[in-house]
Amino acid sequence: MEVKVENVGKSQELKVKVKNFIKRSDCKKKLFALILGLVSFELTMNIMLSVMYVESNEALSLCRIQGTPAPRDNKTNTENTKKETTFHTTTTTRDPEVRETKTTKPKTNEGATSPSRNLTTKGDIHQTTRATTEAELEKQSKQTIEPDTSTKKHTPTRPSSESPTTTQATAQLTTPTAPKASIAPKNRQATTKKTETGTTTTSRAKKTNNPTETATTTLKATTETGKGKEGPTQHTIKEQPETTAGETTTPQSRRTTSRPAPTTKTEEEAETTKTRTTKSTQTSTGPPGPTRSTPSKTATENNKRTTTIKRPNTANTDSRQQTRTTAEQDRQIQTKAKPTTNGAHAQTTTTPEHNTDTTNSTKESSKEDKTTRDPSSKTPTDQEDASKGTTAANPRKNTEANTRTPPTTTPTRHTTESATSTTGDKTKAKTTRWKSTADRQPIRNSTTAETKTAQSKQPTPKQLSNNTTPENTTPPNNKSSSQTDAAPTEEIEIRSSLWRRRYVYGPCRENVLEHPMNPCFKDNTTWIYSDNGRNLPAGYYDSKTDKIICYGIYRGNSYCYGRIECTCKNGTGLLSYCCNSYNWS
């Protein structure tokens, strides 16, 4: 208690002292001044801090805008670059399946194809190898029948636009000739360079003989095409054309999968051989793209059809086919096609030789096969040339191939397999791709007669493939228009297979001249292109000028029937030629 009392007393004393001190006038003034000073200082500091805060925020925001985004962009660019680099390096093809197939199985077809493609084009050798690897991998994985694995060596090399298709064709060609099939891919590779064209043609015949295998091949080719438009993608296309073209030469693996009766083989082989002969003749011809026009009319139709199947897969497929055909081959095809515009007769003559030479005609076939492969070759000029070459070859097939062709022109790429088996022609397979699987296959079977009747119309299919240069396109267009006019009823019957859906690549603002099949050519009719399920307006029909006005960049299938031509400074030709890089198929 005492302590507390003392403490209380001390505190009271302190309070009293403070009160007394405050009461003094001096102290009051000083305290007042101090308080004012503190308040003013606080206010000024608050103001300064707020100003500084605003300014600092602005500065920070500027720094963030300028500095931060740049690093992010750089990182993104770097990452993208790495990704892109990895993607291109690792994957030649766009489709995942194709990639897997490449890694898993680069085999016989690739080996055989690589040499042949190398023969076709120096630039294509590497591409051919890669494309071959992809195509073969897909074929092997899908078909479950693996061609000889010895061919893998070529696969690691560049994926040539021609090579993938060539590889498949080579393996297939080898198969039709039992000894060839027995021969290891190594032999094929060695032989293919010399006889790549023949082998390719044979393989196409083989593919045709085996509808199931052909379908598988076509799908694979399509997958590859999707991945690398110009390089590996085109490879796939080549495979498809080969598969379609080579009914007789169904590869061993394809034979195992599904092989038509030997009789069909012989017929398809004959057709394939015809194609080869025409192609070889064309090979001698010089101009790659433009020269096609004359052969294109009859032969180009088949080729275009083939191109149609391949291109739909990715424009790349077509390029590969084109690359396959050297300018010379394409020219030869054109040359043959011109004499053989009706082509069926000339082709028929050639057919016996090729059929007989299935084993020995590997070299000849290789040249012609180059032409056949050309449709799937990837070089733009070669692509068109190749399509022409194929068409030229097809003119021989025109009687048989034309029957097959109507399905071929219209077919959806997916349907290419069935079309290929039925037709045994590249054109058939191509047609199938364009058509829906259900429609295309029935059309092929039902349109065999129609196709023959439509042969006169085939100039339109030729135009569809736009693998011909504008020059070449014009003669085919004239034929097709005359044919179309001559047999409108047949065209209407056949159009589902032959005329449905034109395929155009890239922007073309040229006027497109159409030789119509009925429902599409009316005023204000809109032409539609289907691109991966998307419907894009491609143009409209003007009855005053009798032209289809093209809107521009569209890629896909046209829902309208008829072949489309465009008027260019270079003259009348297919849309692709008018645009320099865009094709109808």
Curated annotation (Swiss-Prot):
Keywords assigned by UniProt, alphabetized: Glycoprotein, Host-virus interaction, Membrane, Transmembrane, Transmembrane helix, Viral attachment to host cell, Virion, Virus entry into host cell
Cellular location(s): Virion membrane; Host cell surface
Quaternary structure, from the entry: Homooligomer. Interacts (via N-terminus) with protein M. Interacts with protein F; this interaction occurs on the surface of infected cells. Interacts with protein SH.
Family: Belongs to the metapneumoviruses glycoprotein G family.
GO process terms (BP): symbiont entry into host cell; virion attachment to host cell
Compositional bias ranges of the Polar residues kind: 110-132, 299-326, 443-464
Coiled coil: none
Name of the molecule in the record: Major surface glycoprotein G
Originating organism: Avian metapneumovirus (isolate Canada goose/Minnesota/15a/2001)
Compositionally biased spans, kind Basic and acidic residues: 72-86, 94-103, 226-241, 265-274, 364-376
Organism taxonomic ancestry: Viruses, Riboviria, Orthornavirae, Negarnaviricota, Haploviricotina
Glycosylated residues, chain numbering: 74, 118, 360, 445, 466, 478, 524, 570
